[in-house]
UniProtKB/Swiss-Prot annotation:
HAMAP family: UreF
InterPro entries registered for this protein in UniProt: UreF, UreF_sf
Name of a matching Pfam family: UreF
Subunit structure: UreD, UreF and UreG form a complex that acts as a GTP-hydrolysis-dependent molecular chaperone, activating the urease apoprotein by helping to assemble the nickel containing metallocenter of UreC. The UreE protein probably delivers the nickel.
Protein's recorded name: Urease accessory protein UreF
Family: Belongs to the UreF family.
One GO CC annotation: cytoplasm
A Gene Ontology molecular function term of the record: nickel cation binding
Subcellular location: Cytoplasm
């Protein structure tokens, strides 16, 4: 394994201080309301977010950031695509934390940006294949949602790992498609996920920020 790949794995690990564990992407509301009740429901919910929601959207944004496209324009687009105040907060807060930590580690000037653009601006210097960066980023995103479900449904740890394993083919597929997708291909149809994120904003009892 190359040092660049090890660095990327470090940046996308749960130990990296982005605070990802505090965000459920609206999943907490879906669980609390009974829309997601078991392992099968969690797997379907996360798969839909990856395929039809912010998973694919962020992957395309990340791919363009990795290729050195206009980072300011990509950041503006990422903010505009956030379907709720909490989703915007989620991508901006994690992106700022990611940029600050990678800047401290690398000595580079890395301004705060929405998360997929922040990852792209930092990871571009590693020289890793675009598809590989997308796969690892999507995996980290899916793993965080599964971890939230393990804590809140609750599920067993083995059930959670089985869900994540079952999502690997989908992650590979989305990464391949997104690596070459034009920016015009961005679009979302994860309506239930977006509504869950909106409704979480007024959820009175919560353990996650989003």
């Amino acid at each position: 394994m190359s040092r660049a790949l090890l660095t990327l794995v470090q940046w996308l690990s749960p130990a990296f201080p982005t605070g990802a564990f505090a965000y459920s992407h609206g999943l907490e509301w879906a669980i609390a309301e009974g829309e997601v009740q078991d392992a099968a429901g969690v797997e379907q919910w996360v798969a839909d977010i990856l395929r039809f929601g912010s998973g694919r959207t962020d992957a395309i944004l990340l791919a363009h950031a990795l290729k050195g496209h206009d980072l300011e324009a990509l950041s503006d687009l990422a903010r505009a695509l956030a379907p709720s105040a909490e989703r915007l907060r989620e991508t901006e807060e994690q992106g700022a934390a990611f940029a600050a930590t990678t800047a401290a580690l690398t000595g580079r000037a890395l301004p705060p940006r929405p998360l997929p653009v922040a990852i792209g601006q930092a990871a571009a210097a590693l020289g890793r294949p675009v598809t590989e960066v997308l796969e690892l980023t999507l995996h980290a995103f899916a793993a965080n949602l599964v971890s939230a479900a393990v804590r809140f449904v609750p599920l067993g740890q083995t059930e959670g790992q089985a869900i994540l394993s079952s999502l690997h083919p989908l992650i590979e597929e989305i990464a391949r498609e997104s690596a070459e997708a034009p920016i015009e291909a961005i679009g979302s149809a994860a309506v239930r996920g977006d509504l869950a994120a909106m409704r979480h904003e007024t959820q009175q009892v919560r353990i996650f920020k989003t």
